[in-house]
């Protein structure tokens, strides 16, 4: 049955447990989880024109230096910079003179992003997405995890197995986990009392 989980009870027959979550999972799988997670490697040698972002995007700088302008704010780029852009971010890349930016770009729909941030393992009571994108500079283990996740996403683009979408979702959870680990917790909270921008 679609809404039940069955477990074996040491040879005494199956135990059937009702699970309301399975219905939510089925809805997510059939209606929210995208079939077209897209990941590709970009090599940028010259300033790019502005682009209007429509998706949820994770970007990881692999090589080169320069800057990224998002909604009029400049962010320095160097290897192992991880960025998360949301819809309505307007951005462009400007490599340093004589440098080439190498960036892995992985995109998904916003419904999947909402499902990701609702993950109870994030242990965050509030999660607000501000107009300034989260940008973190990684070293050590977190840099290794981010690069491994992007390598996995690039690899799945070539394989496209039956499990590719679920595997890509797990890699993206790794990237979101890194952002929530590195960004100040206040970034994701909304202080309704002060009205001050932090």
List where the protein language model places each region:
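Hydrophobic, aromatic-enriched interface-forming segments
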Residues: 168-192
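Jelly-roll (double-stranded beta-helix
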Residues: 1-5, 48, 135-136, 162, ...
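Short beta-strand His + acidic residue motifs that chelate non-heme Fe in jelly-roll/DSBH
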Residues: 67-69, 85, 90-98
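A hydrophobic/aromatic-rich effector-binding and dimerization subdomain
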Residues: 2-30, 34-36, 92-155, 177, ...
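All-alpha amphipathic helical-bundle segments outside canonical DNA-binding/catalytic cores
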Residues: 144, 157-174
């Amino acid at each position: 049955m679609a809404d039940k989980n069955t477990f074996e009870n040491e040879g005494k027959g199956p135990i059937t447990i009702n699970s309301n979550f399975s219905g939510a999972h089925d809805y997510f799988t059939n209606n929210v989880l995208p079939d077209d997670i897209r990941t590709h490697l970009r090599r940028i040698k010259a300033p790019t024109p502005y682009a209007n972002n429509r998706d949820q995007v994770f970007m990881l700088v692999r090589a080169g230096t320069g800057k990224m302008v998002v909604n009029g704010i400049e962010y320095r780029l160097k290897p192992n910079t991880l960025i998360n852009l949301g819809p309505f971010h307007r951005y462009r890349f400007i490599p340093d003179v004589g440098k080439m930016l190498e960036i892995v770009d992985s995109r998904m729909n916003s419904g999947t992003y909402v499902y990701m941030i609702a993950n109870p393992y994030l242990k965050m009571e509030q999660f607000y997405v501000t107009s300034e994108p989260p940008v973190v500079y990684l070293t050590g283990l977190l840099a290794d995890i981010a690069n491994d996740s992007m390598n996995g996403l690039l690899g799945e683009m070539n394989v496209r197995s039956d499990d590719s979408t679920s595997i890509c979702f797990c890699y993206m959870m790794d990237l979101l986990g890194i952002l929530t680990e590195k960004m100040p917790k206040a970034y994701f909270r909304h202080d309704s009392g002060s009205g001050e921008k932090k």
